[in-house]
Design a protein with these regions (language model features):
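Repeat-based scaffolding regions
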Residues: 1-254
Length: 254
């Protein structure tokens, strides 16, 4: 293959050789080594990278692959290539080598050069979840909220931030505020309403719970579900707020 000048043809021949090694010779490690020789020219090729990673997984060669890419980082001259390579290696450390520190270091480099890199920020979120570093997780989610403009993504981030405050930090007030912000962005999202209703009930904020249940009823299509919510509102008026008049009015609508 060394005498072949055309890069596309050279890659095609190497891929064919790798396929023969794996399927005919039953030597996936040889197939991996064959493709390794094409990395420098083809690491930006999505199909090539998918096959390379498949073989790395099949042969347990992630450490070797990461080492090769670490060497490429040291030799890269394009700032864009350096960032892209750091991103790739960081993900491999996290997902395949379970090395949180190495993954963090590579993503930290990316963010130092590109503080608004949403992909790197999202990856750092995963690292902090794994490490249980809740304060840093709050910071990184807040940073992502500052940079994210897509409404559905902002809703998801507020919901995730609320979960951190509620379940990991134990700050129910902050959690409620996050869920409220998510609701304001998506007033027709039933899943957001149910989460807000759940935490209002847990916090015994009965008036707020009734308000959100009323909003929930407005978007429900199923008649039986509407009846169940209306009955629930009645029981809250009766048992929690001791307002029999409001309870009777709610029951009357069932």
């Amino acid at each position: 293959a060394d005498i072949v000048d055309d890069a596309a043809l050279r890659l095609s021949l190497l891929e064919r050789g790798a396929k023969i090694a794996e399927e005919k010779l039953q030597q996936p490690q040889m197939a991996f080594v064959v493709l390794q020789s094409a990395i420098a020219e083809n690491w930006k090729n999505a199909d090539f990278m998918a096959e390379l990673q498949r073989l790395a997984e099949a042969t347990g060669s992630w450490g070797e692959l990461v080492g090769q890419f670490e060497g490429m980082i040291a030799q890269a001259t394009s700032p864009a290539d350096v960032l892209a390579l750091h991103n790739i290696v960081a993900r491999w450390y996290f997902h395949h080598l379970n090395d949180n520190e190495a993954s963090w270091n590579h993503f930290a480099f990316v963010l130092d050069q590109d503080p608004k890199n949403l992909d790197a920020l999202a990856a750092m979120t995963e690292i902090y979840w794994r490490l249980g570093n809740w304060d840093e997780l709050v910071n990184i989610l807040s940073k992502r909220l500052e940079l994210t403009t897509v409404t559905d993504d902002r809703v998801s981030l507020y919901m995730e931030l609320g979960k951190v405050f509620e379940e990991k930090i134990g700050d129910v007030g902050q959690a409620i505020e996050c869920y409220i912000q998510a609701f304001k962005l998506s007033e027709d999202r039933l899943d957001v309403m149910k989460e807000l209703a759940r935490i209002y009930e847990m916090a015994e904020q009965w008036s707020e719970l009734i308000d959100i249940l009323e909003r929930e009823m407005a978007v429900l299509d199923d008649v039986e579900e509407k009846i169940a919510v209306r009955f629930r509102i009645g029981t809250i008026w009766e048992n929690m707020l001791q307002n029999n008049e409001k309870a009777a009015a709610s029951y009357a609508e069932v």
